[in-house]
Each structure stands twice: as C-alpha cells, then as structure tokens.
Amino acid sequence: MAEKIKLEIVTPEKKVLSEMVDIVVAPGQEGEFGVLPHHIPFLSKLKVGELRYRIGQTLRCVAIMGGYAEVLPDQVTILAPAAEEAGEIDVIRAKAARERAERRLAETKDRLEFTRAQAALQRAVARLKVAEKT
C-alpha cells in the first residue's frame, strides 16, 4: 500500500474534510504547491482558489476562500474562513455572484468598493471552477 498523508480542512463553522490522501495541491499566496507524504514542514498563506487532492485515481476539489496551510510530514491542515466541496456549491448562486461582482467592477469608482468587488469575483470564480469538475 502506498503511503498517504492526512488532509484536514477546517473552517470556523466545521471540519469540512478529513481524509487520507496521496497528494495535496493548494493555492499558495506565492503560487500553487504540492505536498506528498514526508514533506518538510512549513506554513503558507493561501489565496482564494481551488485546492485539489488525489485518493488513488480519483481527483477531488475544494473551493477555499483563503486562509493558511500547515504542512507536516504526515499531515496537511488547512484553516480557511470558508471552504466548499464541489457537491455543496450552488452553481446558480455562484453565477449570480459572479455577475454581480463583474457589474460592480464595471460601475464603481471607489477604490475600496473596487477591491471588495474583485474579492467577490475571485470567490465566485473559484466556486464555479470547482463545481465544473463534478
């Protein structure tokens, strides 16, 4: 049996996921990073995006809304403000959120509102990207 690494994804509301996986690929602030069993320990800030993991031949995805990753030789813990597995994502709601954010980006002149609209767009796009992979 091949070695596995434990992946845990935790939000303030709940433990989203706890699985033994073959590999984790996370959206780090400085770019994606992959983790296999026996990886050197490190901490990383995460950006909004798609976290992928593989169990056997099955690739699965989770939309994460930023946060932090703690990597240990036998475990990856993701602490995120929000995270959704592909099956939990409401595609209609995510598309509506994307359209609202795009409209706000086109209409706003306020710098703070523009930044908020950009963040909303990133979240909606991440959800849609993960939902497409189901």
From Swiss-Prot:
Q: Tell me the Gene3D superfamilies matching this sequence.
A: ATP synthase delta/epsilon subunit, C-terminal domain (1.20.5.440), F0F1 ATP synthase delta/epsilon subunit, N-terminal (2.60.15.10)
- Membrane topology for this entry? Peripheral membrane protein
Broad class of where this protein is predominantly found: membrane
GO-annotated molecular function: ATP binding; proton-transporting ATP synthase activity, rotational mechanism
SUPFAM superfamilies in alphabetical order: Epsilon subunit of F1F0-ATP synthase C-terminal domain, Epsilon subunit of F1F0-ATP synthase N-terminal domain
- Keywords carried by this UniProt record: ATP synthesis, Cell inner membrane, Cell membrane, CF(1), Hydrogen ion transport, Ion transport, Membrane, Transport
The places in or outside the cell where this protein is found are:
Cell inner membrane
Q: Name one GO cellular component term.
A: proton-transporting ATP synthase complex
As for what it does, the entry says: Produces ATP from ADP in the presence of a proton gradient across the membrane.
Please give the family membership noted in the entry.
Belongs to the ATPase epsilon chain family.
Give the record's subunit note: F-type ATPases have 2 components, CF(1) - the catalytic core - and CF(0) - the membrane proton channel. CF(1) has five subunits: alpha(3), beta(3), gamma(1), delta(1), epsilon(1). CF(0) has three main subunits: a, b and c.
Q: What is this protein called?
A: ATP synthase epsilon chain
State the organism named in the record.
Syntrophobacter fumaroxidans (strain DSM 10017 / MPOB)
Q: Lineage from the top down?
A: Bacteria, Pseudomonadati, Thermodesulfobacteriota, Syntrophobacteria, Syntrophobacterales
